[in-house]
């Protein structure tokens, strides 16, 4: 059996269960990735379409292994707990530090794969034949309001709230489509500070820096948390792989002290840096 076939069989079994037996049968077929809905209109020849379809399927299969790790491994859960434990220690240190008292304290968090877990939705999508988590897919998926809490998230957020620290959810979910569903989902999960002042979604600019700047004008931000370099105020948006890594190196002292990163091998800006136009 080809390795790519094994990836799809294992992923469907572990992520989609018995929902999509038909997808398992078609694991080697190009139909596994629904290219008809994502091939740009500028691609006109059958050869170009076939090449693009093959590239997309390879990327989808590669990301499936990362998603499988997130969905099933004990190590991923351990890293989530570790991230929140480190973050809680940093918050308590900041609360006890008088130098931080000039402004009210705040933390800034990403949403997806930081406080909420979408791996079940992504697994079901792959089992149904889609392995490309682009903007249209995200808007439809999160609109369902079925995101689950990350391990340790509810306890962490409520403890931060009890400490008197403001919580801001800065996400690139699309506000005109996803705001109401996001707020409802977060409230159902038991997250605190879920309102229009604290849930800051993408409206006109996917660069989070303007939202970071607006928060920093009123608050002393003691912690940023996310699964993407763009979740931190370090200017990685639109940068090349080399530039992104250089920026991270320049901020190495901030990780574990002001920044807490969660692992995400399934999707993110690192993918678009590898394959332009594949993922935003």
Model regions and ranges:
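Surface-exposed patches in mature extracellular/periplasmic domains of secreted proteins
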Residues: 95-106, 167-172, 194-198
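Second-shell loop/turn segments in exported
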Residues: 69-80, 139-147, 168-175, 200-202
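Structural recognition of the beta-strand scaffold that forms the well-ordered cores
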Residues: 106-110, 116-117, 166-171, 200, ...
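C-terminal cap/substrate-recognition subdomain and adjoining C-terminal extension
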Residues: 28-33, 38, 42, 74, ...
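Non-catalytic pre-domain segments flanking phosphatase-related domains
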Residues: 2-5, 12-14, 18-109, 273-280
């Amino acid at each position: 059996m080809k390795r790519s076939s094994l990836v799809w069989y294992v992923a469907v079994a572990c992520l989609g269960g018995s929902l999509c037996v038909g997808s398992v049968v078609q694991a080697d077929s190009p139909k596994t990735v629904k290219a008809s809905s994502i091939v740009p209109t500028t691609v006109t020849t059958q050869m170009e379409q076939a090449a693009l379809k093959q590239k997309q399927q390879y990327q989808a299969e590669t990301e499936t292994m990362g998603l499988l790790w997130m969905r099933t491994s004990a190590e991923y859960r351990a890293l989530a707990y570790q991230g929140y434990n480190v973050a809680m220690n940093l918050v308590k240190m900041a609360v006890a530090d008088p130098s931080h008292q000039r402004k009210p304290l705040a933390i800034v968090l990403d949403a997806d794969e930081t406080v909420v877990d979408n791996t079940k939705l992504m697994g079901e999508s792959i089992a149904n034949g889609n392995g490309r988590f682009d903007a249209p897919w995200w808007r439809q998926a999160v609109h369902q309001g079925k995101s689950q809490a990350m391990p340790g998230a509810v306890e962490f957020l409520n403890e931060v709230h009890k400490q008197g620290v403001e919580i801001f959810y800065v996400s690139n979910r699309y506000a005109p489509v996803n705001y109401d569903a996001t707020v409802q989902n977060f409230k159902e999960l038991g997250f605190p500070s879920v309102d229009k002042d604290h849930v800051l979604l993408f409206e006109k600019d996917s660069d989070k820096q303007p939202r970071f700047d607006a928060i920093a004008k009123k608050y002393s931000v003691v912690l940023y948390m996310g699964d993407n370099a763009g979740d931190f105020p370090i200017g990685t948006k639109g940068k090349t792989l080399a530039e992104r890594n250089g920026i991270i190196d320049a901020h190495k002292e901030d990780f574990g002290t002001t920044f807490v990163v969660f692992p995400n091998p399934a999707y993110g800006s690192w993918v678009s840096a590898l394959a332009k136009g594949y993922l935003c």
